[in-house]
């Protein structure tokens, strides 16, 4: 059995992880970017970890993020209270609420990712690049410092 350790980030990284996952006779460990993790609407999101899990489970959304056949009922209702650009599906929200519950119990992101990987019955190890918060920041030409999700999603940059 060959051991493969793969560093993954973004939607493209999740697609390549799926390719490795589908190889025969390998022991796969995927170390996933957490620089895009962020709190949105009071919920801590780990989008790159989720994209890898969804891709390996075969349930990734058509654009490579979120879950296929997801609904956005909570998101639409929430827009009545707070204007927003970020769309989080109901199934995706459920996973992130579960992650937040585990954080509130004192578990680390590594422990939480292992639990979620087991829930999806995946036969590999998925690890966050860090248990600490490491944020990707973008400094604009006018000097404003933005979180990655704000830059990428809200400004559509």
Per-range role (PLM):
Residues 20-23, 46-47:
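Short, solvent-exposed amphipathic alpha-helical segments in soluble enzyme
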Residues 24-29:
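A generic structural motif
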Residues 12-17:
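Short glycine/serine/threonine-rich phosphate/pyrophosphate-binding segments
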Residues 1-5:
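Extreme N-terminal starter segment of soluble prokaryotic enzymes
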């Amino acid at each position: 059995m060959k051991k493969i350790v793969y560093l993954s980030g973004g939607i493209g990284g999740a697609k390549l992880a799926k390719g490795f996952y589908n190889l025969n006779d390998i022991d796969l460990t995927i170390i996933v970017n957490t620089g895009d993790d962020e709190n949105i609407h009071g919920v801590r999101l780990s989008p790159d970890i989720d994209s890898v899990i969804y891709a390996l489970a075969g349930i990734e959304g058509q654009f490579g993020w979120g879950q296929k056949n997801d609904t956005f009922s909570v998101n639409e209702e929430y827009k009545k209270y707070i204007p927003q650009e970020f769309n989080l599906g109901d199934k995706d929200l459920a996973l992130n609420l579960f992650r937040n519950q585990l954080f509130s119990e004192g578990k680390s992101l590594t422990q939480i990712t292992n639990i979620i990987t087991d829930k999806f019955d995946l036969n590999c190890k998925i690890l966050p690049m860090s248990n600490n918060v490491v944020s990707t920041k973008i400094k604009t030409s006018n000097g404003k410092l933005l979180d990655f999700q704000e830059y990428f999603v809200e400004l559509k940059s």
